[in-house]
Each structure stands twice: as C-alpha cells, then as structure tokens.
Amino acid sequence: MPSMDIVSEVDEEELRNAVENSRREVAGRFDLRGKEIEIDLKDNVVTLKSEDDFICKQLVDILRIQLSKRNVDPSSMEVDEKAVHSGKTFSLKVNFKQGIDSLVAKKLVKAIKDSKLKVQAAIQGDSVRITGKKRDDLQAVMRLAKESELGQPFQFDNFRD
C-alpha cells in the first residue's frame, strides 16, 4: 500500500547559504555601506543587527529574497514583531519553523478527511503519515497540502509504493 510522510523542514545548508549570500549583498549595496550590520545564524535562528530599525526591515527583505533564490520557502520564517533596541543597535530575530506543530497537523488531517479521498492520515510527532490504496490518491493529497493556506510550507518524504 503506498504511503508518504508530510513534513515541514528547512534545509540547514540552504539556509546557511542564503545567510552568506545576504551578507555578501549587504556588503555590496551602496545604501548600506558604512553602516554597522551583522547577520548571524545559530540553531535555525537568524539574528539581524543594525544601527536603525528601518535597516533591520531591509535586512529581512534581503534575507527573504536570498531564501527564494535558494529554493527555501520564506513562509517558514517567523520574524519578531518589533526590533529590540539595545545600546546603539537594533536587533531582530528570525526563527525558522521546523516540524509541523499539533494544531497545524490537526487542521491538515481535517482538510484531508474533508476532501473525501480514500486515504488514512495519522499524526506522528512532527509529521503526518498518509496511507492510501492508489498512488493517485497520494498525489491528490500532495496537491491539497500545497494549496492549503496553513502558514507553513510542506515537503513530502518516504514516498513508498
């Protein structure tokens, strides 16, 4: 019986590459030259530091663009509401969602069951296991998951026939 897992993960290597590319772009931009800017990545959290709140927002946009270029879905970003001011710098933290939390998993399973497809959906930790009789049903679930607006990108693993 065909089965697959629906997961939500960010490729750490691509994330690191996007952060490095963001640093290079900031170093080459004329409007940001001479400003104190730091972009740090640690444990799937990117810290953006600059002299100005507006520049922090520009750094978030630069990071989004670089993530898109590296095929990492920017909707996995959780940006802090407000930049934290400490001393003469502003800092913003950008977290990346790893795994599907239980509330999103329940909504996804409900959407799959409401679609009347002949598949079984089971929540397994931070992923959702889908089992069905036909490969076409699993592909329909893939389409449904990609089209659902649950605020999180989904990837598909362990596709077995």
Curated annotation (Swiss-Prot):
One GO MF term: nucleotide binding
User: Does the keyword field hold Nucleotide-binding?
Assistant: yes
InterPro entries given in the database record: DUF520, UPF0234-like_C, UPF0234_N, YajQ-like_sf
Which UniProt key words apply to this protein? Nucleotide-binding
Q: Does the keyword ATP-binding apply?
A: no
Give any Pfam family that matches: DUF520
One cellular-component annotation, GO: cytosol
Q: Which domain of life is it from?
A: Bacteria
Q: Which CDD domains match?
A: YajQ_like (cd11740)
**What's its job?**
Nucleotide-binding protein.
Tell me its family: Belongs to the YajQ family.
Per its record, how is this protein called by name? Nucleotide-binding protein Sfri_0732
Organism annotation:
Shewanella frigidimarina (strain NCIMB 400)
